[in-house]
Amino acid sequence: MDEATGIDVYGHNGMAVGDYDGDGREDLYVCQPAGLPNRLYRNNGDGTFDDVSAVAGVDVLDASTMALFADLDNDGDQDLVVVAGTRLLLFVNDGKGKFTLRESSGFQPSGATLTSVAIADYDRDGHLDLYVCAYDFWASGANYNAPTPYYDATNGPPNFLYRNRGDATFEDVTAPSGMGQNNNRFSFAASWADYDNDGWPDLYVANDFGRNNLYRNNGDGTFADVAAKAGVEDLGAGMSVAWGDYDGDGRLDLYVSNMWSSAGQRLTFNPAFADVAADAGVRASFQRQARGNSLFKNNGDGTFSDVTLQVGVEFGSWAWSSGFWDYNNDGRLDVFVTNGFVTGPDTHDL
């Protein structure tokens, strides 16, 4: 459908910012839909940019959802990771303005549609590791599964944790690390952060059609999914994750974007909806799906409190990416949410 209509069913295409040529200026890499080459724009330092995509060797034609610059081989320059359909592409920077696609990176094809990647040195060995989110098998055309049940689906493809061997080649450590726990969702995004201040990066995963994951780093190369215990499963339509200390108490709080729908709220809170979903718990799950975004305050004891409605940050329409940002320079973090989807000319009920 993407190629035929130009509509990306997995959301908008992302971009990455990084100084790929080491001149002290931030350059831009822009992901595109299938058939259009991705673009690398070199910053000239005077407010203008040059398109160096083809010269640099990163004009990928595959549908790309996101990219990240990171020094994955520890040679001092920024390499590039691109999430492209069912593949994760690693371009190694030669330090002279050109990239080479590494075919033997160790990334194994899963057949699933990949949506995003998060980077951190989870085992603190000095090498950056990758966590890769997968959504479904639409891009490959194989083993398509409709999310079942819709409000708490557990028939999605697995995500992957790749450990960096130190030379920008990777090994799949999903199972031995413990990240195979609850690893059957429809994942859109993940973000690393040390939420419990123990010095080890933890990981939150936003899943569509159901519960999210919070993988607490045990400090020995393994993780435990503590989302339920911490109070951040957030059973909804997870789209993105943002960490930030919104209340200035020195602890990282958690913002998760979902979907806000007035039509969905009207339908699911209608007494007649009980004829469709007789179980009260199921009805509550559908109602949560339409409530919108969530803000969880870090209590400092390994748990979080849902302060969404008190703070007033639930509304975001059909939300996608989100982030904390002090846009007015008052020393307090604000929240920015991108949103929107395909709709008709009548928008009053969105």
Kindly give the residue locations of the regions a language model identified.
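Acidic, glycine/proline-rich Ca2+-coordinating loop motifs
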Residues: 1-350
